[in-house]
Amino acid sequence: MIGELCRSAFCLGILLFASVLWGQELRLGTTYTVEDSGLLKVLVPAFERARSIKVRAVLAGTGQVLRIAEKGDVDVVFSHSPADEEKFVAAGFGVARFDVMYNDFVIVGPAADPTGIRGEKDAVGAFKKIHARRAKFVSRGDDSGTHKKEQFLWRSAGLVPKWPDYLSTGQGMVRVLLMAGELQAYTLCDRATFSAQRAKAGLEILSSGDPRLRNEYGVIAVNPARHPHVNRQGAQAFVEWITSEAGQHLISNYRIGGEQVFFPGAKSRR
């Protein structure tokens, strides 16, 4: 009898704990690329089922996501600009950064390829050709991880992207792809979003394969010492889950048109 009562009390405790977690939503700050690729729609429901924690996604470019997190307006960050994420942690806004996954960026453009970059393995060389021809180029211009990578490539080329047909939009990746398609322009895009939007954009991958185009994603719990109100338990649960075998398996198995667009990368801590 006592044993039954203990077991009942134990089970009740678990249920109450789970209900508390479910009642306190987790605010996940993440990027448009995770949403636009469709991956977020796979990860969030799986996490909610596994940990009984309700998730509310807050979407923005990486730079904006980190600024939102600095204010304590999200509990955990899932983004793709390692250098900025490391600065975020070093400044005391995040607990620690963990690698989650990676893919790559690609330079896409019209099939006619007026600059002749098709097959170019040197991304900086491709940007130099685009600049030399003053070709149409649509930029995110939004301080996102993709925009930061584009800026890195221009700096590496020793060039300033400023000519009449260089358009800085301040828009998300899908809108930029559609604009580039309408204008028959070039742009830099993460491979996953391009795979998801290829048919609508009407563009082609023209340059890829440069190691400098690697696109790494990390996860960071917002520091409760800086913002005591954050959902500390929920954030830690998300970090543990997405870097676990279960989370990594979902990432590895995610496909767009049969193509693997993300690769598990939860190996090291930054």
Regions found by a protein language model. Name each.
Residues 9, 44, 104:
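Short amphipathic alpha-helical/adjacent loop interface patches that line ligand
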Residues 75-76, 95-108:
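Short, glycine-/small- and polar/acidic-enriched structural segments
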Residues 8-20:
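Bacterial N-terminal signal peptides
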Residues 22-54, 58, 63, 67-73, ...:
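Exported/periplasmic ABC-transporter solute-binding proteins
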Residues 1-6:
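N-terminal secretory signal peptides that target proteins for export/translocation
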Residues 88-96:
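Hydrophobic/aromatic-rich structural module bridging two neighboring secondary-structure elements via a short loop
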